């Protein structure tokens, strides 16, 4: 169930391209415009997507990853294993993690069937560096609404905000991946996880038929 919630949630996290980005210092504006741009692209490019579902990787690479804190999220997933990894191991892992996100997020976007969304009203940021933004996803086919909290983090150097995690039903996506990959990290280390991520990233994206 959580895996499905995570995939549905990713439908609204794909941010804007650099040329049309919203105010990078306001995570609420980023979330709002990102959702609108993403849904528009999914709707307008269905012919290309249906002809070649792996085209979704391109959308992810162009529109999402430049505005997601990939390395920060990847380091959180590694936890204690990050500090013990060599620079070469980290570089290989982050490259594999990025390719994994292209496949995983692309597969999530393949679930698009006309969903709509509501974003919580903007709250004062103050001096906060981590801000959760509640998004409610509404399914046109009558499924119950899904309420999610996207975690946005302020870059201490640039002042810009980027998304790095999502919490559904009190469970963090980062925590879920830590639990899912924990045994592999304990037995085969970061190299074993890197190899698995490379394998997963090679899987073809498949479209979910409308139910």
Swiss-Prot record:
NCBIfam families according to UniProt: PRK15117.1
Name of protein: Intermembrane phospholipid transport system binding protein MlaC
Keywords: Periplasm, Signal
GO BP term (any one): intermembrane phospholipid transfer
GO cellular component: outer membrane-bounded periplasmic space
Subcellular localization, as worded in the UniProt entry: Periplasm
Knockout-associated phenotype: Mutation leads to accumulation of phospholipid in the outer leaflet of the outer membrane and increased outer membrane permeability. It confers sensitivity to SDS-EDTA.
Sequence similarity: Belongs to the MlaC/ttg2D family.
Signal peptide span: 1-21
Known function: Involved in a phospholipid transport pathway that maintains lipid asymmetry in the outer membrane by retrograde trafficking of phospholipids from the outer membrane to the inner membrane. May transfer phospholipid across the periplasmic space and deliver it to the MlaFEDB complex at the inner membrane.
């Amino acid at each position: 169930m959580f895996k499905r919630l995570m995939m549905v949630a990713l439908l609204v996290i794909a941010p804007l391209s650099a040329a049309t980005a919203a105010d990078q210092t306001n995570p609420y504006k980023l979330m709002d415009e990102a959702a609108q741009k993403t849904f528009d692209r999914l709707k307008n490019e269905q012919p290309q997507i249906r002809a070649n579902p792996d085209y979704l990787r391109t959308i992810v690479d162009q529109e999402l990853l430049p505005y997601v804190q990939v390395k920060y999220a990847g380091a959180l997933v590694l936890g204690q294993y990050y500090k013990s990894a060599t620079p070469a191991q980290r570089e290989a892992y982050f490259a594999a993690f990025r390719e994994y996100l292209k496949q995983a997020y692309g597969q999530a976007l393949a679930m698009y069937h006309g969903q709509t969304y509501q974003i919580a009203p903007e709250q004062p940021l103050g001096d906060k560096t981590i801000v959760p933004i509640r998004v409610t996803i509404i399914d046109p086919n009558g499924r119950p609404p899904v309420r999610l909290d996207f975690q946005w983090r302020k870059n201490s150097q640039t002042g810009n905000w980027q998304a790095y995690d999502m919490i559904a039903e009190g469970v963090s996506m980062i925590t879920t991946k830590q639990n899912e990959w924990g045994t592999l990290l304990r037995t085969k280390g970061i190299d074993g996880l890197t190899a698995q991520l490379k394998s997963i990233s090679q899987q073809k994206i498949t479209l979910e038929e409308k139910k």
